[in-house]
Amino acid sequence: MNKFLKATTAFIIAIAITAIMIVTANAESRYIEKNFTFDGIAPTVIIHHPVYDWVLTAKGNKLTWQKPNGSASQMFVMFPSEYDGYYRIREFNNGGYEQRYIGYTPSGFKLVWQEDVQAPAIAFKLVWKAKDTVSGKSVKNVWRMPCKMNNKYFCVGGWGCVRIEQTNA
């Protein structure tokens, strides 16, 4: 009986460990992270709005969100600096007016998002590398989309809720 009890206990422990490993693996695999470095040969990303599509394009030093009819857009532009060789990243609204300065980078933008494949909630952010002016250390800067609305959509400024999908990368 003692051997049977030990064997049963070992079997139950093995099943429990296997179950924990499966749950952990599934939790990790639920998220898909995709990176794009914008260097002039970037993918076009279609943003699916409940009513219409927004388009994200990257050409040269510009990263642009735009409505297909051109009635509204938002642009991030990298300006080369003659002082230190870095690019200054500035944000413009659809009227072409600068809204804010968001950082600087030695190379390009990187687009990163994580998608929950079971109930696709999408976290979207811009990432770029820079150098801390005080310590001289390399740092990573992140510009995040403002808010999560529910399990399906993210809110982009005042534009409503969107879903982001890779199209041609």
Where do the model's predicted regions map?
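Lectin-like carbohydrate-binding module/patch detector with strong preference for beta-trefoil
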Residues: 28-169
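Sec/Tat signal peptide C-region and signal peptidase I cleavage site
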Residues: 22-28
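Bacterial N-terminal signal peptides that target proteins for export
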Residues: 1-12
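Bacterial N-terminal signal peptides
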Residues: 11-20
